[in-house]
């Protein structure tokens, strides 16, 4: 491992094998390295430099999740798994940064998920780095049809994270030369709002309105409903008891409540995952896919939308609930706006 002084004019150049072992020792299940000058990082560069000026290398990592927790029909189990694994990999990142810092090497670890830069709410990105983009460039997998990264071994049962460092690495990673996605389209079949399509673009709005209901969009509507209520007795006419309880839970415990995520649950890709699917596809569908399709639940959609039409046609036993204030906000989220200025360009 080559290490230079913190005050040297040129940053350290680290041995890739040493850095990889460091990350694995602290809990990462796989790791790859990307230069900030890599063409694939052109959109991430300003966000990386906003987090830490002088960034030279992005360290992409994955941590495995428990597959059966993610597959559970009890969404509280899947949500707890996502939160707990995210917490674990944040601790991994922190330990790596501290060890590099002890060696005189600057490093920073943006959060895996929350907290985000929510004062930017309404801009296209309230998070810092796009961990998916880094992971693909770092050789940790490719995006499947469901827009999640599929690791060649662990499948989509992973949480992604990124560490930034001023050091360069003597050997950078490359994207893998194949996509682990099987094209089985089980994610298409299980999505209650029809957001995932074989022959069309991903419907961001449909996914966001339902899956992220307990996040900012639902919270904003909840506040509006409180303001519109005449008094406590009138409040249940505007926001149901079950909705209130769900909002309370998301605020009081872990800000990670997703209402669906079924696309992750049913995905059979990945060397460690695919065996049972290849052995008996019908059993995979019967035990994992069908229970999620048959689950009776409320699905949040815009009235008259393609998501509502899909829901009523494919899942008539699931009940639509109309969202009233999110379309404007959601479209704002996907509009383009300037990225944060690079430090050298900032006034």
Task: Please give the residue ranges for each predicted region.
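Non-catalytic, usually N-terminal nucleic-acid engagement modules in DNA/RNA processing proteins
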Residues: 1-87, 91
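Polar/charged alpha-helical tracts
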Residues: 17, 21, 25, 102, ...
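Catalytic cores of enzyme domains
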Residues: 42, 84-271, 275-288
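Short alpha-helix boundary/capping motifs
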Residues: 51-52, 128, 219, 291, ...
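Compact disulfide-stabilized, cysteine-rich extracellular microdomains and processed peptide cores
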Residues: 123, 280-281, 285-292, 297, ...
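Long, internal scaffold/assembly segments composed of regular secondary structure
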Residues: 252-255, 270, 279-280, 294-304, ...
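Short, C-terminally biased terminal segments at protein or domain edges
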Residues: 286-288, 292, 301-310
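Long, compositionally biased charged/polar accessory segments in the mid-to-C-terminal portions
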Residues: 303-343
């Amino acid at each position: 491992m080559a290490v230079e002084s913190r005050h040297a004019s040129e940053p350290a150049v680290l041995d890739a094998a040493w850095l990889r072992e460091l990350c694995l020792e602290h809990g990462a299940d796989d790791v790859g390295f990307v230069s900030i000058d890599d063409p694939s990082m052109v959109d991430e560069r300003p966000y990386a430099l906003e987090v830490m000026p002088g960034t030279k290398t992005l360290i992409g990592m994955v941590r495995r999740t428990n597959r059966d927790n993610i597959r559970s029909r009890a969404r509280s189990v899947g949500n707890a798994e996502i939160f707990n694994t995210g917490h674990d990999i944040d601790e991994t990142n922190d330990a790596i940064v501290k060890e590099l810092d002890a060696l005189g090497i600057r490093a920073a670890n943006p959060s895996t998920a929350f907290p985000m830069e929510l004062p930017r709410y309404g801009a296209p990105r309230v998070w810092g780095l796009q961990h998916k983009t880094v992971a693909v460039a770092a050789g940790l997998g490719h995006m499947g049809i469901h827009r999640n990264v599929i690791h060649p071994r662990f499948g989509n049962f992973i949480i992604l994270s990124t560490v930034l460092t001023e050091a360069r690495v003597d050997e950078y990673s490359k994207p893998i030369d194949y996509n682990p996605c099987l094209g089985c389209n089980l994610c298409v079949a299980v999505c209650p709002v029809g957001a995932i399509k074989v022959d069309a673009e991903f419907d961001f709005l449909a996914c966001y309105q339902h899956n992220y209901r307990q996040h900012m969009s639902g919270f904003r509507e909840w506040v509006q409903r409180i303001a519109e209520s005449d008094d406590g007795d009138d409040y249940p006419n505007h926001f149901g008891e079950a909705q209130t309880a769900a909002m309370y839970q998301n605020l009081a415990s872990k800000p990670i409540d997703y209402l669906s995520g079924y696309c992750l649950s049913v995905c059979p890709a990945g060397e460690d995952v695919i065996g049972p699917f290849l052995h008996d596809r019908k059993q995979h569908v019967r035990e994992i896919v069908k229970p999620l399709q048959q689950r009776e639940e409320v699905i949040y959609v815009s009235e008259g939308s393609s998501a509502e039409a899909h829901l009523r046609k494919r899942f008539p036993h699931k009940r639509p609930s109309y969202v009233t204030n999110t379309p404007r906000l959601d479209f704002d989220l996907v509009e383009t706006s300037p990225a944060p200025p690079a430090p050298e360009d900032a006034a």
